[in-house]
Amino acid sequence: MYDILQPELWVKIIDYSGEINLLLTDKNFFELFNLIDTKVDVVEYIVKNNLIDALKYFILLKKLRHPIMEKNIVTIKSLNKCLIKSCKKNKLNIIKYLVSLGADIKAGDDCAVQLASQNGHLEVIEYLVAQGANIRADNDYAVIWASRNGYLDIVKYLVSQGADIRANNDYAVRWASRNGHLKVVKYLVSLGANIRTENDYAIKYASENGYLRIVEYLVSQGADIRADNDYAVGLASSNGHFEVVEYLVSQGANIRVDNDYAVRLASSNGHLEVVKYLVSLRANIRARCDFAIKWSSSNGHLEVVKYLVSQGADIRSQNDYAVRYASTNGHLEVVKYLVGQGADIRTGDDYAVRWASRGGCLEVVKYLVDQGANIRAKDDYAVKWASEKGHLEIVKFLISQGAVLTKN
């Protein structure tokens, strides 16, 4: 293949493409390295692509002081960088070779063993430890991240090597709980991890993320479900984790704290099943000036909006906030429903049509105009901002309806 073009043409092709993989296909191409302008670190590229034979050849040229090495300098710093990346990517054969060339496994505060632990590469960790890596560097980063990412075998190995599972205020068990790694959580607790640190962080965030089995286990170990003003049930509701909410309530969680935070956030995020359940427990859907209906409307959750209205929510609260922000965010079906329930689209100097225009919501704008919205309110705010934001179709429509677009 090399012979089909002149070397200078190959150089131009490689410089134009920025790709050096062709240079690694045979020795003839490899000789072109000194002629190209690419800034690619050759060693790093070779390691990234797991080309150990190419790496060995490259190092051989260095030992022979081949002219090509005048441009491609191999330093300990570059070897260390490649070692760390190889540990992250589980390239044990290249790791061993880099170490044989002088790469420092402890470079960057033992970054290599930390990243191998974080990414679940047990054999790499064992090799690095055999070479003297410090698993406790950076406040036991290795065991913390192995726990956080659910690598039980690595956690056990690091513990056998002296890792402190309670480092950084029991970070390991807190994040294993938050990320849903039950086996890791149980193992850490069996070794004395404190599940109640940071104001019961573990159960709060396990609840927030919907890990029912972990929540149940933490409760069995003495976690306080009501910590931090019933944060657990509030965040479980906010994220729609019905089973977790139901369980926390069965354990005594108070759904009404913080001005009915639970039902407000469940409504805001569109979790109808949770909303209905909380209402069945006497949650106040009208708390905080009808926050629930306002934000479910603003976020476009039509079924939640309908349910809240059926339960007595005031769609006109705070100067028709619901229809104004449903319009602003382009939720046409919600806007139509609210209008059908008596919402006033013209409140706030025709806020709804002005901000629907500004936000580029053409269908909402058309509907509001059809319902009698004044597109010229606030000195033709609607067309000015539609123009400013680049919404050409809205500008055309508004002008066709009598809006006046003036030059500043």
Curated annotation (Swiss-Prot):
Q: Which domain of life is it from?
A: Viruses
Keywords (alphabetical) are: ANK repeat, Repeat
Q: Where are the ANK repeats?
A: 78-107, 108-137, 139-167, 168-197, 198-227, 229-257, 259-287, 288-317, 318-347, 349-377, 378-407
* Coiled coil start-end: none
A Pfam family found in this protein is Ank_4
Q: What is this protein called?
A: Putative ankyrin repeat protein L483
